[in-house]
Amino acid sequence: NFQKGYAYFTAKNNKEAAKYFNMVVNSKTFGSQAKYYLGYMSYETDDYKSANEYFEQVSDQDKYKEKMGYFQADMNFKLGNFQKAVDLGLEQMPKSRADEKSELSKIIGESYFNLKKYDKALPYLLDYKGKKGKWNNTDFYQLGYAYYQQKDYENAITQFNKIIDGNDAVAQNAYYHLAESYLKTD
C-alpha cells in the first residue's frame, strides 16, 4: 500500500496517495514515511494544522528532521506561532540551502517584527532576497517600520519612499510613518 501511495504521490494525485498512505500510518515499516508524506501534502495545500500534526509525529527521526525544519518554521509562522517559528528557523538556518536561507530570513525577520522585536528583525529582513529577487510593498514597509522603531529615520525614509505610490493600507501607513520620520529628522 505504501508503494501505491508513493506512486500516486509522485504522479501528483494526492487524493489517491493519501488514501494509501492512511492505510499504513500505523505500520512499523512504513508508518513514519506515510506520515511524512501526508504532512507534506497537507503543507502543500495550506492545511498547516494537519501538516504540523503529521510532522510532529516524525520530527524525532533524523531522516526527516532536516527536510522538516523549514516546513515547520514556515507553518508556525503562518499559524501565528512567531516565537516557535523563530526558534525553528534559527535552528534550521545553518543546515539550509541558499534559496531556503532567504525564505528562512523572511520567516525569522517577520516573526521578530510581529513580536515587536524590531532590533532583532532588522538583520533578517535585510537578508531576505525577495520573491524571484523582488520585494513587495509589505517587505519594504516592514523594513522601514523596523528602522523607524529603532529611531533610524534616514533608513526608514528610504524604505517608506519605495512604496508611497500605492493605494492600499500599506501605502497609507507608509505615508504616515514617512511624515513622522521627516518630522523627527528636522
Model-identified regions with their sequence ranges:
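Acidic, polar-rich low-complexity tracts and alpha-helical solenoid repeat scaffolds
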Residues: 1-186
